[in-house]
């Protein structure tokens, strides 16, 4: 997305190619401070305020989406802090191997629907990756490289601003993140590790990571090229600091949540991949789906490897699934197993 495309979504009342914007570098910060800062900054802005870019490296923590509950999603207590961020999306691991950024844009400057924010909001990151030779593309709210998720993002309206956050992921600790996710069995965690390795990637898996200064400068240049923002180094004002302090405890994960998983019985691995497991009495079904189809299924009744091959070709419909299972479980039980699989599986999420 170039400046001309962005102009259709951003209406500043003046030339979109010359929009002054504030760059606020927080340095290395604690998790709660990071999330409180961008939320407080957004809450303190007025309609005529310039856009803001918040840049930071954040201490290790699990960041939950605004509608997630720690007790439902995680193996609590954990050795790292848990913070429920004011943005959407699912559970994410954040640490110093990521460079986090948040774009804050007064709604008065925007034309598009919230679903369109990811187009302009992630365009600078795509341009930044390209500057280092990485062919990254946007896939909805995610950024992908060679078909694997490289970054996720979350957005929300805070005060009178659109807020969108993401990060440059240099290195991702797969096992450490998987060990934090609530699991009904050890096998679920093992499947999650394999799915994460298969579906996710990081910068260092493709190229040596750049220095923070090189990445910082490339991102600033990309913001100018894609959004037309002329960045000025700035700091939090006293009024903004007051707004930040007022909301500083608001995003702690101990706050009451929905007490249910965002994905029933499991987790969204990336945009079109879900891992779920459900136990009913002494029976269980574990299901990995990809692009609306079965990728792998395990049952307490036991399934041979040949079943996975057949199920991958099976549409997620009761009759088709029952017929496919009939060759691997007692025929009189095929219907109940088909029902359990379909009740367990997730093929899409909001």
State where each predicted segment sits:
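Active-site loop/lid in soluble adenylation, ligation, and acyl-transfer enzymes
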Residues: 2-75, 85, 155, 184-185, ...
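A glycine-rich, hydrophobic loop/mini-helix early in the fold
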Residues: 76-107
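Contiguous, small/hydrophobic- and glycine-enriched helical/loop subdomains that border
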Residues: 96-144
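Short histidine-centered catalytic/ligand-binding loop motif
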Residues: 102-118, 201-210, 324-328
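Active-site glycine-rich loop that binds ribose-phosphate moieties when present
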Residues: 120-128, 148-152, 186-188
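A contiguous pocket-lining binding segment that forms or flanks enzyme active sites
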Residues: 138-183
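Glycine-rich, small/acidic residue-mixed loop/short-helix segments
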Residues: 298-333
């Amino acid at each position: 997305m170039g400046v001309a495309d962005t102009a259709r979504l951003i209406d500043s009342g003046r030339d979109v190619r010359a929009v002054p914007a504030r760059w606020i570098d927080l340095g290395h910060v604690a998790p709660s401070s990071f999330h409180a800062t961008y939320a407080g900054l957004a809450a303190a802005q007025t309609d005529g305020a310039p856009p803001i870019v918040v840049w930071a490296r954040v201490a290790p923590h699990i960041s939950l989406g605004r509608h997630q509950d720690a007790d439902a999603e995680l193996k609590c207590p954990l050795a790292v802090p848990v913070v429920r961020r004011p943005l959407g999306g699912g559970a994410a691991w954040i640490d110093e191997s990521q460079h986090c950024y948040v774009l804050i844009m007064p709604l008065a400057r925007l034309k598009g629907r919230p679903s369109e924010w990811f187009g302009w909001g992630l365009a600078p990151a795509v341009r930044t990756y390209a500057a280092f030779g990485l062919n990254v593309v946007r896939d909805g709210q995610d950024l992908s490289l060679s078909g694997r998720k490289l970054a996720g993002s979350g957005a929300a309206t805070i005060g009178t601003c659109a807020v969108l956050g993401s990060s440059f992921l240099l290195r991702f600790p797969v096992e450490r993140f998987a060990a934090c996710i609530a699991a009904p069995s050890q096998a679920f965690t093992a499947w999650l590790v394999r799915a994460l390795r298969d579906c996710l990637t990081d910068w260092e898996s493709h190229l040596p990571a750049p220095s923070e200064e090189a990445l910082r400068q490339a991102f600033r240049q990309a913001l100018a090229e894609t959004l037309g923002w002329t960045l000025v180094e700035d700091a939090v004002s006293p009024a903004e600091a007051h707004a930040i302090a007022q909301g500083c405890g608001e995003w702690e994960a101990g706050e009451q949540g929905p007490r249910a998983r965002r994905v029933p019985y499991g987790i969204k691995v990336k945009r079109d991949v879900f891992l779920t497991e459900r136990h009913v009495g002494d029976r269980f079904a574990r299901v990995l789906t990809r692009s609306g189809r079965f990728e792998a299924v395990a049952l307490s009744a036991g399934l041979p490897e040949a079943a996975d091959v057949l199920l991958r070709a099976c549409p997620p419909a009761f009759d088709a699934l029952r017929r496919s299972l009939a060759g691997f479980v007692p025929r009189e039980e095929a219907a109940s197993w088909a029902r359990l699989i379909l009740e367990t599986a997730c093929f899409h999420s909001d």
